[in-house]
Each structure stands twice: as C-alpha cells, then as structure tokens.
Amino acid sequence: MTIKLGALDFAAGGLSLEEGVATAEGLERMGINAIEISSGCSETGWAGAWPYAGVSRKRALEDKLFHRIFAKPVPEGHFLEETRRVRERVKCPVIAVGGLRTVETMESVIKGGIADFVSLNRPFVREPDLVRKIERGKRGVVDCTSCNICSGYAGLHGLQCWIKTNKDLLIHAWCRFTGQLH
C-alpha cells in the first residue's frame, strides 16, 4: 500500500515539515510500502502546478498561455526538499512528485538518492505515451507546459490538454475573462 503525504501545509498553524517527516516515520512503522511526498493545501491558495514550474516565459508565449506569461516562475521539482528530508529518515521507498518537467531532473532525483521513484500526473494528460518516449530516448522538457488548465476544468469538461488548438485556448481565455473559471 502506498500513500500520498502532504509533508508541509505552508499555513500558519498547519503541518510543519518536521511533523510531516514524523508522520512519514509513523506510517512506515505501521507497514506502509511507499510514500509519495507532496505539500501545500488548498486553503493557502497553493494549487499544485499553478505556479507553472519549470516552464519559461518564452515557452508560455509560444504556447499562447497569456494568463501566465508574467507569473512568477517556480523552480522545477517544487517538493524535492520535503522529499529529501523524508528520504533521509525512512527506509521504505519514497516517491517524488510536483513539477518534474525534464527527463534529466527525473533521473537526477533517482540517481541522487532524493527519491526511489518519480510520479507524474499532468504530463500524462498531454503525453499519454510519455514513458515509452523516454524509453526510446526522449530528453529535455516534457510537452506539458504546467499551465494547469486541465485541472481548472476538472469536472466541467472531459480530461484533456487544452494546449492542442488555438480554439481551445480561446475558449479557456474567454471562460477566465467572463469569470466562468477561477
């Protein structure tokens, strides 16, 4: 059995990293087989890939992601410090997740001992065959731009990547402009 653990809340009075690490140790003692490390909570406004980890402004402009061109960039792999801290204290496999957008970073996370595995979510929405591409030699940045539009429409439209056509991007921009998407 695996568990996804929010190791840090980023909120006043919320879970501290030390408490998160202690929780991971307790889960291991209970017999958990692996722990995926995440952080943040919706109450703080921290919304996963919303900061657009690992995607340059140039790429945002090329992909017509106008709503994020001036967004403050966040380094790729935004939960790696939390993951590293848990990895240091547990023996069960640890899984890194959160804004991993280059094959080289994914490899360095494993080779560097930060985690035993990496977990991806949004990149598979854009590239369902991503693992096969990496096996065949794909290097560099994955096609997912971390725009988070797929997440923003969760429950409103079928799961899809919205960076496929200009029409989809215009629909997204209109929904944001008219307040139909927050």
What are these regions (language model features)?
Residues M1-H182:
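Flavin-dependent oxidoreductase catalytic cores
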